[in-house]
Amino acid sequence: MNHLRAHILLAAALCINTLHAQSSDSAIVSILQQKDVVFTHNNKVVLLPSGKEKFEDMFKAIAQAKSSVHLEYFNFRNDSIASALFDLLKQKASEGVEVRALFDGFGNDSNNKPLRKEHIDSLRAHGIEIYEFDPIRFPWVNHVFLRDHRKIVVIDGNVAYTGGMNVADYYLHGTEQVGEWRDMHCRIEGGAVSPLQMIFLKLWNRVTEQDIWGPKYFRAYKPTEIHGLRPDTTSTAGHKKVGIINREPRISNDIIRVFYTEAINAAQDSIKLINPYLTLNRKLKKALRNAAKRGVKVEIMVSAKSDIPLTPDCVFYNVHKLMKKGVHVWLYQPGFHHTKVIMVDGKFCTVGSANLNARSLSWDYEENAVIIDKPTTRQLDQMFDNDKQKSVYLTPETWDAFRTPWQKFRGWFAHLLTPFL
């Protein structure tokens, strides 16, 4: 019996040593591959860290489309940038390009400049196929769950855009409420475009009851015929390893949670995290505490301002608790940081649509690009470090100056509602 116990303990020790010997990027790839995530190795990735850069680059790409333009957004806010986009899409449709667009019913209804029936009818009259995903009809309020929160654009099957931005003027000009609106998007060329196209077409066919498929939509390995875009100037351009994690309710429920939790658990040196709605769950809180405890430098950036009520109270409550466990917390001051990124050990990162709240972790349709690439991660690390210059470092003293006793109580109360935020 003692022999058996000794063998079991030895085997466990070997497993632990092997896990710690494995680099964090290798570990996360292995874990995601077990969840059927496919990584391709021939990608270019260009970060687009502002609305101006995203829309300028994307409009240039759409203007050169030859075959198809597919768009999937939580919402198209009916303002000037959406009007400019739709004018461009009308032009492409008149040239014979297939233009398809999806938007979420709740995302549309919950913004203050929604697309109305007359707008949709006009777009269809100009050759744009546009459909609303799961419209909300009274009294079926249960439909506020399982929303499509993705942000995907695929052009000619070989250029894709994804990240945290919808289509709205405030990505360019900010808002009176919060000021500057910061966010992150990226452009991908290479094999990782095909999974994004598959995600779009699967939902498109479900919503429209069409059967759109075939090789013309999957041209990720063919040379890009779109020119004049912002180049990938890194040493790894065309050789980046990228996987797409797709949260689809009832099919891949836990993929976002698994990625973030295991990325944090795998970290050996550093974690830098920006997320606007950091309500977290128990596993993520525990992972962050444990990372700090084992000597990983954990840095989190959240906005001092927010676009919605209650959720930020929970966020501030969480980061204060984490601060007391050794996590470095920064409160971004100039505006609202809507960015959703994590960078680990300077080796890998993610850019995508997923927040770290109950909706993204447990309910909504989401997708993120996981980028296993040091130069791209370094670019995001540099952005984080630059933004620290515009932020307040959280300490017991700055916490007391930042939050009144009433606000602290409100945060405690809000954290009780975490499963619903």
List PLM regions with ranges.
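N-terminal secretory signal peptides that target proteins for export/translocation
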Residues: 1-3
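Bacterial N-terminal signal peptides
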Residues: 7-17
